[in-house]
């Protein structure tokens, strides 16, 4: 939470210039403290619906132990749902009409499964664009996760994602490339982020539209960037919300696809994710699966209990720090009325009053 500059101590101004969160005393005296309302547009398929809720709810809830958060999950009617997923949505989710009527302080938009080479052909394309446009006009800041980053870059900026040729899959080292921005204030200057994607939006594509890249990787490319105003759109290409076992679950799914004949080659191990012991266990399991396939006998199950305790999480603390900075800035600049994006005096074109 922010410091209050209640005196002329030069340290306050120094910290503010370094990107720290410092409130002017006159504003702090009149600040109306309230809970924040954060929307979660969950576009994930049924099998990942609840897990994605937990990941993002946990990321928000653990990032700040003082503020109170009301989470408002909703989805798009155009996304295909089975009976179980539809029942979950109908019972627990709000409608976009309700979201628009009551307002949000901030919005998180998840990724989604895709089947078309052009995102504009996906069933979520037009309704997602409607949500993003509404949020741009009515919400303090919107955080776009992976696939949504690609969709917004295409719909809003005309930049199509590009196929990498091979899947980027694993945990990769990243570096903060602009330490002055408030979103990365106090964050480790080097940290890990999981990635799981075939496609990429490059640094050059962000730069063409004066979008500011804050965190990137030599191997994985851009992870964190922001819109030209510095805050109203926040772009992730990685998956900082992932649990320690998320990549293991993805690996298990790909192994099952191999077993069922849905892919020809056995899946590779995620990069920089597994300890030597865990990698050895999975290599032995691969040999047993391939032998079972040759003999046409049932394949052995993935030995998850042996693996879970051998998985390191090298990204969660930094993810919490970035999200905490995001929430802290939303808290400072949002209006008391959550149907209005900014408090009086905040310039929507430069809400952070931050100079690039």
Curated annotation (Swiss-Prot):
GO CC annotation terms, alphabetical: cytoplasm
Chief location category: cytoplasm
One example of a Gene Ontology biological process annotation: methionine biosynthetic process
Pathway in which the depicted protein is active: Amino-acid biosynthesis; L-methionine biosynthesis via de novo pathway; O-succinyl-L-homoserine from L-homoserine: step 1/1
InterPro entries in the cross-refs: Class_I_gatase-like (IPR029062), MetA_family (IPR033752)
Site entry (Important for acyl-CoA specificity), positions: 113, 147
Catalytic activity as recorded in UniProt: L-homoserine + succinyl-CoA = O-succinyl-L-homoserine + CoA
UniProt xrefs under PANTHER family: HOMOSERINE O-SUCCINYLTRANSFERASE
Function statement: Transfers a succinyl group from succinyl-CoA to L-homoserine, forming succinyl-L-homoserine.
Protein name: Homoserine O-succinyltransferase
Organism for this UniProt entry: Thioalkalivibrio nitratireducens (strain DSM 14787 / UNIQEM 213 / ALEN2)
Underlying gene: metAS
């Amino acid at each position: 939470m922010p410091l209050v500059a209640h005196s002329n101590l030069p340290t306050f101004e120094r910290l503010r210039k370094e990107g720290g969160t410092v409130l002017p005393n006159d504003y702090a005296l009149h600040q109306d403290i309230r809970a924040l309302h954060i929307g979660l547009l969950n576009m994930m398929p049924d099998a990942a619906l609840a897990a994605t809720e937990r990941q993002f709810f946990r990321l928000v809830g653990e990032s700040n132990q003082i503020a109170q958060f009301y989470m408002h999950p909703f989805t798009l009617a155009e996304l295909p749902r089975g009976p179980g997923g539809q029942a979950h949505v109908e019972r627990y989710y709000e409608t976009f009409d309700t979201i628009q009527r009551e307002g949000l302080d901030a919005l998180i938009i998840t990724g989604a499964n895709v089947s078309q080479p052009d995102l504009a052909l996906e069933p979520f394309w037009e309704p997602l664009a409607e949500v993003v446009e509404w949020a741009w006009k009515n919400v303090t800041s919107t955080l776009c996760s992976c696939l949504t980053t690609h969709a917004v870059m295409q719909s809003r900026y005309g930049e199509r994602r590009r196929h990498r040729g091979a899947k980027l899959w694993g945990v990769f080292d990243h570096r903060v490339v602009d330490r002055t921005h408030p979103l990365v204030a106090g964050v480790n200057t080097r940290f890990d982020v999981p990635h799981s994607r075939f496609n990429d939006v490059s640094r050059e594509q962000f730069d063409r539209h004066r979008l500011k890249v804050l965190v990137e990787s030599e191997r994985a490319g851009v992870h964190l960037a922001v819109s030209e105003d510095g805050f109203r759109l926040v772009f992730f290409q990685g998956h900082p919300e992932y649990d320690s076992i998320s990549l293991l679950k993805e690996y298990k799914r790909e192994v099952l696809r191999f077993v069922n004949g849905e892919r020809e080659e056995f899946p590779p191990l995620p990069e920089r994710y597994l300890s030597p012991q865990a990698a050895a266990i999975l290599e032995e399991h691969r040999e047993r699966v391939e032998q079972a396939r040759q003999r046409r006998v049932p394949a052995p199950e993935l030995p998850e209990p042996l693996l879970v305790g051998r998985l390191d999480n090298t990204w969660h603390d930094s993810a919490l720090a970035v999200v905490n900075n995001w929430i802290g800035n939303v808290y400072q600049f949002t209006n008391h009325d959550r149907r209005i994006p900014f408090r009086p005096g905040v310039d929507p074109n430069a809400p952070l009053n931050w100079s690039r």
